[in-house]
């Protein structure tokens, strides 16, 4: 009789323990499966997220084989408005230039420049001080391509033509002799200098242009003197190269 009672009791205890442990085992199985799938997902995510960087060189297509180019810059010019004036004048304006390249090294260049500013004046009874003066240049000549690579270049040029000097526009109707100015006139002009270019792309260039400017003005009063002046000019701007037409 004791055997029959103990057996059902032991069986009942074993069954109860099994029922209690079953959820724990199931939870551990799910946790292990979730952890395994998480590792796989993270690995896949890291694999697909890795990209390749492509380096683009904006100067890769820079070639010195274009037939035409044009440039425009803000310009500065120092000059003297009269043959005996002690003070010079600093003028500002625009510098427009264009080139037609004949060979790899040689081309023809033209320029049009306008400068405007005020100038010192000789003592006068009309209290004229700091009148406006202007110069308009036009010229053409050869240019030569010097050292160059994809980053930049040096170009030399020598252009000759004329200048229209307007010196009497702000004298209140008085003659130029009152302030020792030149008369309004057309005169010979020469521009000798060059360009310093910094390429920014196949088409666009940052350009600095220093020049020596020669002028030959005269006066029609007094001794009718003619003055040969050499002054400094500088412009800073941009150049555009038309690359479809090759040399």
Model-derived regions, located:
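Bacterial N-terminal signal peptides
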Residues: 10-20
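Gram-negative (and chloroplast) outer-membrane scaffold detector with strong preference
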Residues: 97-177, 187-189, 193, 200, ...
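Short glycine/proline- and aromatic-enriched beta-strand/turn motifs that initiate or cap beta-hairpins
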Residues: 27-100, 239-243
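Extracellular loop and loop/strand-boundary signature of outer-membrane beta-barrel proteins
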Residues: 57-58, 80-84, 121-131, 174-182, ...
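N-terminal secretory signal peptides that target proteins for export/translocation
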Residues: 1-7
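Outer-membrane beta-barrel "beta-signal"
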Residues: 230-247
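Transmembrane beta-barrel outer-membrane domains
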Residues: 63-67, 87-91, 101, 129-137, ...
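Sec/Tat signal peptide C-region and signal peptidase I cleavage site
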Residues: 21-27
């Amino acid at each position: 009789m004791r055997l029959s009672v103990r057996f059902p009791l032991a069986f009942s205890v074993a069954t109860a323990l099994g029922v209690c442990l079953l959820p724990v085992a199931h939870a551990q199985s799910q946790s292990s499966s979730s952890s395994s799938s998480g590792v796989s997902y993270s690995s896949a995510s890291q694999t697909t997220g890795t990209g390749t960087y492509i380096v683009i060189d904006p100067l890769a297509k820079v070639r010195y084989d274009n037939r035409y180019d044009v440039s425009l810059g803000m310009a500065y010019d120092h000059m003297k408005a009269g043959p005996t004036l002690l003070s010079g004048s600093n003028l500002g304006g625009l510098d427009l230039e264009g080139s037609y390249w004949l060979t790899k090294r040689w081309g023809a260049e033209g320029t049009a420049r306008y400068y405007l500013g005020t100038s010192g004046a000789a003592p006068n009874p009309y209290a004229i001080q700091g009148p406006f003066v202007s110069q308009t240049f036009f010229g053409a000549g050869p240019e030569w391509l010097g050292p160059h690579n994809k980053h930049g270049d040096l170009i030399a040029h020598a252009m000759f033509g004329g200048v229209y000097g307007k010196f009497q526009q702000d004298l209140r109707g008085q003659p130029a002799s009152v302030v020792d100015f030149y008369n309004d006139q057309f005169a010979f002009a020469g521009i000798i200098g060059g360009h310093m270019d910094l390429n920014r792309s196949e088409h666009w260039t940052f350009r600095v242009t220093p020049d020596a400017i020669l002028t030959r003005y005269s006066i029609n009063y007094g001794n009718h003197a003619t003055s040969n002046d050499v002054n400094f000019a500088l412009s800073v701007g941009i150049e555009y190269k038309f690359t479809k037409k090759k040399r």
